[in-house]
UniProtKB/Swiss-Prot annotation:
The gene is ahcY. It is found in: Cytoplasm. May play a key role in the regulation of the intracellular concentration of adenosylhomocysteine. It comes from Prochlorococcus marinus (strain MIT 9313). The keyword Hydrolase applies. This is Adenosylhomocysteinase. Pfam families: AdoHcyase, AdoHcyase_NAD. Belongs to the adenosylhomocysteinase family. Keywords: Cytoplasm, Hydrolase, NAD, One-carbon metabolism. GO terms for biological process: L-homocysteine biosynthetic process; one-carbon metabolic process; S-adenosylmethionine cycle. Substrate binds at T67, D142, E202, K232, D236. PANTHER family: ADENOSYLHOMOCYSTEINASE (PTHR23420:SF0).
Amino acid sequence: MVAVPTSTASLQALPQYVVADIDLADFGRKELSIAETEMPGLIALRIKYGSEKPLKGARIAGSLHMTIQTGVLIETLVALGADVRWASCNIFSTQDHAAAAIAASGVPVFATKGETLDEYWAYTHRILEWGDGGTPNMILDDGGDATGLVMLGSKAESDSSVLDNPGNEEETALFASIRTKLAEDSSFYSRIKSSIQGVTEETTTGVARLYQMQKSGELPFPAINVNDSVTKSKFDNLYGCRESLVDGIKRATDVMVAGKVALVMGYGDVGKGSAQSLRGLGATVMIAEIDPICALQAAMEGYRVVRLDEVVQDVDIFVTSTGNFQVIRHEHLIRMKDEAIVCNIGHFDNEIDVASLKDYPWENIKPQVDHITLPSGNKIILLAEGRLVNLGCATGHPSFVMSNSFTNQVLAQIELFSKGDQYADQVYVLPKHLDEMVARLHLEKIGARLTELTKQQADYISVPVEGPYKPDHYRY
């Protein structure tokens, strides 16, 4: 592994990548080639915009899981003219052969599977540091860590007390990394912040952070909420999780899902896909929800809607998918049955109170699979240390569904980079006609043929023949 730099001055002297093993590049390239055949949206954008180079001049700081599918995204951005630097947004989600292949192509990549928290924040800093002393002008984010780093760092420039009281292990590493950077360059973050033309955000949790900044008047640049494009949230979040959740659980444990009792906490799009996946393999699935509408949806689908504290001792497989924190707390963990499997498919690692288990005996079974002995003598199986199980214990969503999400990301980057002056410092979603375009680009691959409206039919329902076909408020 290449050493992490300790000062900005050393950047140009170091190789512009940090990967586990650059010799994995050939393996990664073979898988990239296969993934491209399953990602028609991204390939269509290369064909449509490749000669125009609409991202020429864009310097994109990318913080998103460094997987094979992300490699196809990165190479699409480059094909459209962008300069790109990349880090993963999760310490366990990198596929090392994917990182090696992209690094070998000349794109600066800073990502390894199983990073420490110190390494994670060092690598996130590296995507903000161009070797020529320049700065990024765009951020492509997943979970909001890159955006949040810039914002918190700029606050710390004028008031270092914001770094005084870290609330957990992750904040301890984050705050230390900011202090180190400020000691080298006291205006680093504000300089980055002023150079950013726009941010595109991939996931629910990161979008929530953006809306919080907008509400408080602190958002300093326009942002596009990619997550709430229909072709992202109703496909990636639902159908992606429907396949990748059980993939992660079974790779980690080899457990028979049929006959088990599973509890999915949260019944949004991610929870819906997760519940379907477990039911599809024969589990008895229950749902925990705070939202009466989501709870009613779950009940109408035939799931029992329950409270965690009333069923915790009966559950074999726990899955958190809420985007909240302290969902499974210490009081729940210590009551779990012997060999209960505990995992999370929400973005951050604080849905499960893993920190409260640190003083109990841990036995590592294999990477991202730990046996923890409770005071009762029961053992639980914790997957990916409470981080994303589908990426920590498997390889994430399939290429086809990620093509939907990443096609939205590319369109959002083009929109903000080329038309950023037309946007206020607010959070936007992509217009409906682009959402429909993303869907169209994926139909032929799966043999779907659209029916076409006649002009008379279109006039009858007051829509254009070519769409969009639904109003913005329509719920799919």
